[in-house]
Amino acid sequence: MKNVMFIGYGSMARKVHEMLPKNIILSTVLVSTRSAEIIKTELGESIAVITSVDDLIETPDLAVEMSGQDGLKEHAIKILGKSIPLGIISVGAFTDEKFAISLADTAEANGVEIHILAGAVAGIDGIHAASFAGLSDVVYQGKKHPSSWKGSHADRLIDYDNLVEPTVFFTGTAREAAALFPDNSNVAATIAIAGVGLDDTTVELIADPTLEYNIHHIMAKGVFGKLEISMAGLPLVENPKTSSLAAFSALRLCCQIDQVIQM
């Protein structure tokens, strides 16, 4: 048996919890003060619900962040300081260079690993492998239904009422995209970190009222040749802003801690 801790308990964490195999136990949930009592009632007494890393009673084999950038920045350093390996969904937080350096330094000092989760896309392993030989161009296009962009910085850029065809509303670097759209563009930061970096990865964000699926399209060129990946992914039913595959990538990491053969 292995124990895991979740940072955050929103729609993604609930989906991962629901799908955990019997040999992986959710022992602790770290949440905000305002939601703690509600989540305690929901989970019962078998799972510890805490609001600070200082309240941790049992040290888990792995912590997985599914809280968003604010939760990650609040708790990650203390978690790594307790020598707990950490999986991260909110990769957009790496646009904060000071925070990213602090994460790496703390993990190294305490002999633990930080796992950057692939999230909503495939091909991250190929892009990272190609980066060792040299990549010249990496372009990511994120296409989603307008409803998936609502409530984000896109509200200032999109005329939702008059949107009738696919519209590119943002073009910039992965650093800019992940900072402006933290809930929607963590995947852009993941691709960038795996490849040519946050400042040299081009990102296009598109609102398309005809879509039923979220479309993630990656194009890369380098010494290895050319790579092109297009994925049509369903969002979680509980949260249209969250990719179901992102939840499954977190589930995969949880399952790996009890597997001898690693993929």
From Swiss-Prot:
Entry-linked Gene3D superfamilies: Dihydrodipicolinate Reductase, domain 2, NAD(P)-binding Rossmann-like Domain
EC top class named in words: oxidoreductase
Catalytic site positions: H216
Pathway in which this enzyme or protein is active: Cofactor biosynthesis; NAD(+) biosynthesis; iminoaspartate from L-aspartate (dehydrogenase route): step 1/1
MF GO annotations: aspartate dehydrogenase activity; NAD binding; NADP binding; oxidoreductase activity, acting on the CH-NH2 group of donors, NAD or NADP as acceptor
Keyword annotations: NAD, NADP, Oxidoreductase, Pyridine nucleotide biosynthesis
BP GO terms, sorted: NAD biosynthetic process
Taxonomy, superkingdom: Bacteria
Binding site residues for NAD(+): A120, N186
Pfam families reported for this sequence: Asp_DH_C (PF01958), NAD_binding_3 (PF03447)
Catalysed reactions, semicolon-separated: L-aspartate + NADP(+) + H2O = oxaloacetate + NH4(+) + NADPH + H(+); L-aspartate + NAD(+) + H2O = oxaloacetate + NH4(+) + NADH + H(+)
The EC number(s) this enzyme carries: 1.4.1.21
More details: The iminoaspartate product is unstable in aqueous solution and can decompose to oxaloacetate and ammonia.
HAMAP family linked: NadX
UniProt-listed PANTHER family: ASPARTATE DEHYDROGENASE DOMAIN-CONTAINING PROTEIN (PTHR31873:SF6), L-ASPARTATE DEHYDROGENASE-RELATED (PTHR31873)
Stated family: Belongs to the L-aspartate dehydrogenase family.
Role played: Specifically catalyzes the NAD or NADP-dependent dehydrogenation of L-aspartate to iminoaspartate.
Protein name as annotated: L-aspartate dehydrogenase
Organism: Psychrobacter cryohalolentis (strain ATCC BAA-1226 / DSM 17306 / VKM B-2378 / K5)
Taxonomy of the source species: Bacteria, Pseudomonadati, Pseudomonadota, Gammaproteobacteria, Moraxellales
Gene this chain is encoded by: nadX
